[in-house]
UniProtKB/Swiss-Prot annotation:
Sequence segments annotated as region (Disordered): 1-30
One GO BP: response to copper ion
Annotated SUPFAM superfamilies: Cysteine alpha-hairpin motif
Main location class: mitochondrion
Cellular component GO terms held in the UniProt record: mitochondrial intermembrane space
Residues reported in the UniProt entry to bind Cu cation: 34-35
Entry protein name: Cytochrome c oxidase copper chaperone 1
Length: 74
């Protein structure tokens, strides 16, 4: 007999190392936090300047939701 990886002709599955690297790459944000969600950031910042932070919770929360969707933990 020869030294085959498997007797039934199937190739064994690859090690789990590449999948771990791919999983961590998927969870890491692709942008810097300052550059993510420019639309909600602009609305949030303009509202805070004009009306104060307490009056802009809707825009602040919308920006946080957008950042979380981009992979940031805020």
């Amino acid at each position: 007999m020869t030294d085959q990886p498997a007797q039934n002709g199937l190739i064994p599955p690859p090690t789990s190392e590449p999948s771990k690297a791919a999983a961590s790459a998927e969870t890491k944000p692709k942008k810097r936090i300052c550059c993510a969600c420019p639309d909600t950031k602009k609305l949030r910042d303009e509202c805070i300047v004009e009306h104060g932070e307490s009056a802009c919770t809707k825009w602040i929360e919308a920006h946080k939701i957008c950042l979380r969707a981009e992979g940031f933990n805020v």
